[in-house]
């Protein structure tokens, strides 16, 4: 085998390895519109005693679903109707909106990891059978990636770590400090809100490339 043939083979192998590495760092993306999670007590307060959420469609994360039920959320300066409830019911009530939504409401919710609502913004929810005022619970959710422990090992990351994601599309956009969330119950998927999606022309089903920071954030 001559030198030129060897160089050609080496170049091909390097290219294949590069493509494999790139593919291994690819993460599916999904756009999450405004929605709310309700406690059992608040489900009953909004929809009636003994009421249970009914499934409209399954979500990508196992066991989670979009309910048929919707509510109106009310802030100091405005309201938004038909905000989808996600099920099943949780231990606490939480409303997730985009920055654009918050401006319409006249509210100033903090950027938080889902579930971290302590000292967050107040919000009123209105349902067909009643309304409730929550002194905290309105947040803008941080961009995050759900993954299993096996996924985390493959990507070389751990729960609570932050990474960088660059979308692949007409308007490549880099999202910084994307939170890693690891659980055996999760399915690999990155979640961003509608503001982030609109800025990068990103749609559910698009992919991004994960890269690590030199130092943990």
UniProtKB/Swiss-Prot annotation:
InterPro entries xref list: Asp_de-COase-like_dom_sf (IPR009010), PTAC (IPR008300)
Cofactor binding mode and count: There are 2 Zn(2+) ions per monomer; Zn(2+) and CoA bind inbetween the 2 domains in each monomer.
Binding site for Zn(2+) 1: 35, 37, 96
Top EC class, one word: transferase
Predominant location category: other
UniProt keyword terms in alphabetical order: Acyltransferase, Bacterial microcompartment, Metal-binding, Transferase, Zinc
Enzyme Commission no: 2.3.1.222
Residues holding phosphate: 90
Domain of life: Bacteria
The protein's required cofactors: Zn(2+)
Residue positions binding Zn(2+) 2: 144, 146, 191
Pathway(s) this gene product operates in, as recorded in its UniProt entry: Polyol metabolism; 1,2-propanediol degradation
Catalytic activity: propanoyl-CoA + phosphate = propanoyl phosphate + CoA
Subcellular location(s) per record: Bacterial microcompartment
Binding site for CoA: 31-33, 77, 84, 198
Keyword Cell division: no
GO BP, sorted A to Z: propanediol catabolic process
GO molecular-function term, one example from the UniProt record: acyltransferase activity, transferring groups other than amino-acyl groups
Cellular component, GO annotation: bacterial microcompartment
Entry text on domains: Formed by 2 beta-barrels, each is capped on both ends by short alpha-helices.
Family classification: Belongs to the PduL family.
Biological role: Involved in 1,2-propanediol (1,2-PD) utilization within the bacterial microcompartment (BMC) dedicated to 1,2-PD degradation by catalyzing the conversion of propanoyl-CoA to propanoyl-phosphate.
Database matches in PANTHER family: PHOSPHATE PROPANOYLTRANSFERASE (PTHR39453:SF1)
Protein known as: Phosphate propanoyltransferase
């Amino acid at each position: 085998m001559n030198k030129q043939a060897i160089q050609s083979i080496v170049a091909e192998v390097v290219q294949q390895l590069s493509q494999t590495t790139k593919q291994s760092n690819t993460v599916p993306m999904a756009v999450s519109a405004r929605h709310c999670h309700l406690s059992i007590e608040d489900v009953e307060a909004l929809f009636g005693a003994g009421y249970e959420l009914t499934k409209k469609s399954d979500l990508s994360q196992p066991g989670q679903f979009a309910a048929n039920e919707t509510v109106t959320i009310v802030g100091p300066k405005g309201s938004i109707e038909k905000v989808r409830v996600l099920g099943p019911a949780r231990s606490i009530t939480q409303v997730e909106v985009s920055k654009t939504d918050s401006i319409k409401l006249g509210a100033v919710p903090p950027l938080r990891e889902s579930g971290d609502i302590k000292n967050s913004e107040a919000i009123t929810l209105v349902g067909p059978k009643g309304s409730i005022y929550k002194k905290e619970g309105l947040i803008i959710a941080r961009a995050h990636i759900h993954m299993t422990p096996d996924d985390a090992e493959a990507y070389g990351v751990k729960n609570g770590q932050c990474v960088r994601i660059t979308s692949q599309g007409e308007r490549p956009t880099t999202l910084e400090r994307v939170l890693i969330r690891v659980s055996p119950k999760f399915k690999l998927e990155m979640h961003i809100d509608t503001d982030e999606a609109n800025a990068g022309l990103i749609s559910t089903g698009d992919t991004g490339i994960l890269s690590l920071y030199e130092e943990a954030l």
